[in-house]
């Protein structure tokens, strides 16, 4: 059975997360239903990461095994036709080796988090940003973010229901920048690592937002990390500002990755 990699984009608002759930809409469920329309039968896809309720995908990657040796372009076109009207799109597809795995072959994952700073309701970006009414000190947040770089025990920044065998991870990048969005000034967090703990990125952002307001100092972030105690974490920010932006592999998988 040929195996295909799929690059997936989705708006997380109508879904209870990526993972298939009974009686709840999910991104995985939507794609598997579309697969059943082009090849009757039950299909199970595997993904590079299982995003939570409300979290978006810009470059999620999944794989599926099919009976037919599809042309990758025609496969993506067929799936997009049957995915309508769900806010899910297959933006690229590729034939891969049988042993290639969307999750286990990945060597890095990149997340983007968006904060919109404005008082008026965000009509166009509603559900796609974490909106706050106050300004943030980006330099202070970057100083706090720098405390988290490298290999650490991130117990403070993982959820109590995290199933990872170890809280030790290596954080390769946590970059904070101010940008001018269409709806107003935004702060973007660019986060990169091989893998993440459950709620790790949202815990980082919620904690750094406290630094940006002046409620915490950058050194407080270091103290929280060293505490190795979930109670030392700042607030966990909402999921709807979070995007799985990119998944990296040792060799380019999709034609769009080679451009």
Swiss-Prot record:
The reactions it catalyses are:
uridine(38/39/40) in tRNA = pseudouridine(38/39/40) in tRNA
Record's Gene3D superfamilies?
Pseudouridine synthase I, catalytic domain, C-terminal subdomain (3.30.70.660), Pseudouridine synthase I, catalytic domain, N-terminal subdomain (3.30.70.580)
| A Pfam family assignment | PseudoU_synth_1
> What's the protein called, per UniProt?
tRNA pseudouridine synthase A
Q: Which organism is it from?
A: Ruegeria sp. (strain TM1040) (Silicibacter sp.)
Protein family according to the UniProt entry: Belongs to the tRNA pseudouridine synthase TruA family.
- The protein's superkingdom reads Bacteria
Q: What is its EC number?
A: 5.4.99.12
CDD domains associated with the record: PseudoU_synth_EcTruA
The enzyme class is isomerase
Q: Where is the catalytic site?
A: 52 (nucleophile)
Query: What molecular function terms (GO) are annotated for this protein?
Result: RNA binding; tRNA pseudouridine(38-40) synthase activity
Q: Which residues bind substrate?
A: 111
What keywords are annotated for this sequence in UniProt?
A: Isomerase, tRNA processing
The taxonomic lineage of its organism, from the top, reads: Bacteria, Pseudomonadati, Pseudomonadota, Alphaproteobacteria, Rhodobacterales
Function comment: Formation of pseudouridine at positions 38, 39 and 40 in the anticodon stem and loop of transfer RNAs.
> Matching InterPro entries, A to Z?
PsdUridine_synth_cat_dom_sf (IPR020103), PsdUridine_synth_TruA (IPR001406), PsdUridine_synth_TruA_a/b_dom (IPR020097), PsdUridine_synth_TruA_C (IPR020095), TruA/RsuA/RluB/E/F_N (IPR020094)
UniProt cross-references to PANTHER family, sorted A to Z: PSEUDOURIDYLATE SYNTHASE, TRNA PSEUDOURIDINE SYNTHASE-LIKE 1
State the oligomer form and interacting partners.
Homodimer.
Look up keyword tRNA processing and say if it applies: yes
Q: Name one GO biological process term.
A: tRNA pseudouridine synthesis
């Amino acid at each position: 059975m040929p195996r295909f990699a799929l690059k997936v984009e989705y708006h997380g608002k109508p879904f209870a997360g990526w993972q298939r759930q009974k009686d709840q809409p999910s991104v995985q469920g939507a794609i598997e239903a579309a697969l059943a329309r082009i090849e009757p039968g039950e299909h199970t896809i595997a993904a590079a990461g299982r995003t939570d309720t409300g979290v978006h995908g810009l470059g999620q990657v999944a794989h599926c095994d099919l009976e037919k040796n599809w042309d990758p372009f025609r496969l993506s076109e067929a799936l997009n036709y049957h995915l309508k009207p769900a806010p899910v799109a297959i933006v690229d597809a590729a034939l891969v080796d049988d042993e290639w795995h969307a999750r286990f072959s990945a060597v890095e994952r990149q997340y983007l988090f968006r904060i919109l700073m404005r008082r008026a309701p965000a009509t166009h970006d509603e559900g796609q940003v974490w909106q706050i009414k106050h300004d943030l000190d980006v330099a202070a947040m970057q100083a706090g973010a720098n405390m988290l770089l490298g290999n650490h025990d991130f117990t403070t920044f993982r959820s109590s229901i995290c199933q990872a065998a170890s809280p030790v991870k290596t954080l390769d990048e946590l970059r904070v920048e101010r940008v001018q969005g269409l709806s107003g000034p935004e702060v973007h967090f660019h986060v990169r690592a091989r893998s993440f703990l459950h709620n790790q990125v949202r815990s980082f952002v919620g904690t750094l937002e406290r630094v940006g307001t002046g409620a915490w100092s950058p050194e407080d972030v270091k103290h929280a990390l060293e505490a190795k105690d979930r109670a030392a974490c700042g607030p966990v920010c909402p999921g709807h500002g979070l995007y799985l932006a990119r998944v990296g592999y040792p060799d380019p998988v999709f034609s769009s990755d080679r451009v």
